Amino acid sequence: MAQFSESVDVPDMGRRQFMNLLTFGTVTGVALGALYPVVNYFIPPATGGAGGGTTAKDELGNDVSVSKFLESHNVGDRTLVQGLKGDPTYIVVESKEAITDYGINAVCTHLGCVVPWNAAENKFKCPCHGSQYDATGKVVRGPAPKSLALSHAKTENDKIVLTPWTETDFRTGEEPWWS
């Protein structure tokens, strides 16, 4: 009868197997690292707090004080602040004591240029391709296909708070395209 040995020799990992394992690990790590930004691109960014809104910021990133804002601006002035999602937003002075209850997003709906207010002509005029919007941001001349987006503007603790506009657009009577 043949006698079997109790200890079975298990061969050590050879150099070739080790190099294959090391190469596989390196390639997998690089591929996952390259794939991360691609996957991240398709995940939408988180929105702000639950209906809390965004405090308007000036050009230096400081909160806009309503009392100081009204002291330094005339009735009918439209002034840019940093609004929702960091977009430039016009705040309109309604009277010496109040701002309008809406802000006008300054990003042109044609190609995304910032649209300046032309006080002499009482309208917004895009410098890129000539689109024009009335005093409320409604498109009056193309090539821009849509009116400027709106946001709610309200005063809380002497600060301007902007919240998303989800109701019917008062300028067109239609559902807002931006929500």
Curated annotation (Swiss-Prot):
The UniProt record lists the keyword Membrane: yes
Positions bound to [2Fe-2S] cluster: C108, H110, C126, H129
Keywords, alphabetical: 2Fe-2S, Disulfide bond, Electron transport, Iron, Iron-sulfur, Membrane, Metal-binding, Thylakoid, Translocase, Transmembrane, Transmembrane helix, Transport
Cofactor binding mode and count: Binds 1 [2Fe-2S] cluster per subunit.
Enzyme's top EC category: translocase
GO terms assigned for molecular function: 2 iron, 2 sulfur cluster binding; electron transporter, transferring electrons within cytochrome b6/f complex of photosystem II activity; metal ion binding; monooxygenase activity; oxidoreductase activity, acting on paired donors, with incorporation or reduction of molecular oxygen; plastoquinol--plastocyanin reductase activity
Disulfide pairings: C113-C128
Chain ranges passing through the membrane: 21-43
A biological process from GO: photosynthesis
Record's function text: Component of the cytochrome b6-f complex, which mediates electron transfer between photosystem II (PSII) and photosystem I (PSI), cyclic electron flow around PSI, and state transitions.
Subunit: The 4 large subunits of the cytochrome b6-f complex are cytochrome b6, subunit IV (17 kDa polypeptide, PetD), cytochrome f and the Rieske protein, while the 4 small subunits are PetG, PetL, PetM and PetN. The complex functions as a dimer.
Family: Belongs to the Rieske iron-sulfur protein family.
Miscellaneous: The Rieske iron-sulfur protein is a high potential 2Fe-2S protein.
Name of this protein: Cytochrome b6-f complex iron-sulfur subunit 1
Native organism taxonomy: Bacteria, Bacillati, Cyanobacteriota, Cyanophyceae, Nostocales
Encoding gene per record: petC
